[in-house]
């Protein structure tokens, strides 16, 4: 049986976003979108994907985008794109918009791609991101093969990036019209949906694994960073709306450029449905309901854990001699989440 932690307060983990604001020092309390109704944490049951709080799907998004830039270069994925995303994104964070009762849709490769996300609760999201210096108003432009849009519309917030060599400044209006059709439809169909609570919402990194435990495995003193280089709408969704954390353990000596990277922990509360979409080699980890091992494109090693209805990813890095086996950290993480851990000082 999962134990609820004694303490659920912690410094907000800020997310690396290109062009984001300087990092503030918020201590946000994770909250659900205004359109979802919290319910008690359920007994573990078959994982079910969260319902979007509006009547727009990735099929609808693909239809609009096909009219702008042609058929998708690759099958449309109901997740955030990894084409140019930051290193923490692969895994749980790709599905953060669904956790917030929204959608995220992406397709393409490095030369031609698009990504669109829509999420309810626009007023609170804009207010929070503005307070934390990560939102300065609507964005909408096309130029030199790229279109970037970000705006609230009624009760929803839409973000989009489109890359195609044929796009130019003259396409701004028609792209805006297509995206507004999507946001208007979503805003007009907002409804309340069930929100599945989770014990790991707002949980500090030390409740997953402590610096001391990582040190004992890594063989040297480590520092814990929950801070990155900026804040934006994705940070607001991941950290505040979802209550997830980014926990990055690196050598105590050095800075962000020179330190040795050992472990990153990311999570998707009540994200077992997304865990089941992952591909990897099954691993037996005592206490976990399921575990999958896989590798990243740059030498990283992943271990995905399903614990009850939650998805936790452990990622290790190649520091020059190959990434360490993340299963070394798994017993501690699983024990802490299932049996409890002494509150960190």
Task: Please name every model-derived segment.
Residues 21-97, 176-243, 323-345:
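N-terminal "mature-domain start" segment
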Residues 15-19:
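C-terminal motif of bacterial Sec signal peptides marking the signal peptidase cleavage site
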Residues 21, 57-59, 104-110, 141-148, ...:
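Sequence contexts marking disulfide-bonded cysteines in secreted/extracellular proteins
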């Amino acid at each position: 049986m999962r134990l609820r932690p004694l303490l659920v307060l912690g410094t907000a983990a800020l997310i690396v976003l290109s062009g984001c604001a300087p990092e503030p020092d918020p201590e946000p309390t994770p909250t659900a979108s205004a359109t979802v109704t919290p319910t008690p944490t359920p007994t573990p049951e078959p994982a079910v994907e969260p319902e979007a709080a509006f009547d727009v799907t990735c099929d609808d998004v693909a239809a609009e985008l096909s009219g702008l830039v042609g058929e998708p270069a690759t099958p449309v994925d109901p997740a955030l794109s990894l084409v140019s995303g930051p290193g923490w994104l692969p895994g749980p964070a790709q599905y953060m918009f669904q956790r917030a009762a929204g959608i995220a849709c992406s397709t393409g490769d490095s030369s031609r791609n698009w990504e669109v996300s829509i999420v309810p609760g626009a007023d609170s999201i804009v207010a929070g991101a503005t307070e934390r210096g990560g939102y300065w108003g609507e964005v909408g432009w096309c130029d030199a093969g790229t279109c970037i849009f970000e705006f609230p519309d009624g009760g929803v917030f839409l973000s989009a990036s489109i890359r195609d060599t044929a796009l130019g400044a003259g396409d701004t209006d028609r792209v805006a019209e297509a995206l507004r059709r999507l946001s208007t439809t979503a805003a007009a169909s907002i409804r309340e949906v069930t929100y599945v609570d989770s014990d790991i919402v707002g949980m500090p990194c030390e409740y997953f694994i402590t610096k001391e435990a990582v040190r004992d495995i890594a063989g040297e003193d480590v520092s814990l960073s929950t801070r990155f280089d900026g804040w934006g709408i994705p940070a607001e969704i991941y950290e505040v709306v979802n209550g997830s954390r980014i926990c990055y353990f690196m050598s105590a000596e050095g800075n962000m450029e020179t330190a040795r990277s050992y472990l990153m922990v990311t999570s998707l509360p009540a994200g077992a449905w997304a865990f089941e979409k992952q591909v990897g080699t099954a691993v037996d980890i005592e206490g976990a309901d399921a575990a999958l091992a896989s590798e990243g494109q740059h030498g990283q090693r992943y271990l995905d854990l399903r614990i009850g209805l939650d998805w936790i990813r452990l990622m290790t890095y190649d520091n020059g001699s190959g990434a360490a086996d993340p299963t070394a950290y798994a017993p501690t993480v699983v024990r802490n989440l299932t049996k409890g851990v002494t509150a960190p000082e």
